[in-house]
A protein has these predicted regions:
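Beta-propeller domains with acidic blade repeats across secreted/periplasmic ectodomains
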Residues: 1-190
Length: 190
């Protein structure tokens, strides 16, 4: 696993596979020492997939202007089905495309977007929502609903939710407060 220590981030799925955010591969199988013996590619050809969330037999991933669900339907460990969940995200600020995908109560997935992206997000039902600059938002697993939940702070770099539902965010410019409690409909400076 030493080749993955400098990655943007790792996520672990329910089946204890570690998912690498940049290469979208997983470490398999685990040896007796608890370390993975080799990476296996689940999906490739993705454009800067900063947002990733393992879920059931696949994962949600941000790919260019879309959030897609890639899944393995035949059990071979590779994505063979692709479903567009949301589309229309801005791609002007590549270092903070939609990211920090986090499961939340009420069957939502929460995420953040960077400061200089401008887009009009389209749901699976065809509704469109203007989604500009730094924002936190949430969407349903099937893409049927999409809501903006806050504005700012400048470039959200971290999102964490406790088991009790308390949510914390961190920003690139912490303004003396490296971690902030997140409040829906909040307007954060920066």
């Amino acid at each position: 696993m030493s080749g993955y220590l400098n990655s943007a981030a790792l996520r672990e799925s329910d089946s204890s596979q570690a998912w690498h955010k940049v290469l979208v591969d997983y470490l398999y199988p685990k040896s007796a020492t608890g370390y993975a013996t080799r990476p296996r590619v689940f999906a490739d050809g993705l454009a800067i997939p900063l947002g990733i969330l393992p879920y059931k037999n696949g994962f949600y991933v941000q790919h260019c202007t879309e959030i897609v669900f890639l899944c393995d339907t035949d059990g071979d460990g590779k994505a063979d089905k692709r479903e567009v969940i949301l589309s229309g995200f801005g791609v002007q600020d590549s270092h903070l495309f939609p990211h920090q995908f986090t499961r939340a109560p009420g069957n939502w997935i929460w995420f953040a977007q960077g400061a200089f992206n401008y887009g009009k997000v389209k749901t699976s039902k065809g509704a469109e929502v203007q989604f500009d600059q730094t924002r936190m938002a949430r969407f349903r697993y099937d893409g049927s609903d999409f809501d903006i939940t806050s504005q700012g702070p400048c470039n959200i770099w971290g999102l964490f939710m406790t088991m009790e539902g308390e949510t914390w965010i961190t920003g690139a410019n912490d303004y003396g407060c490296p971690a902030m409690p997140f409040r829906e409909s909040g307007n954060y400076t920066g």
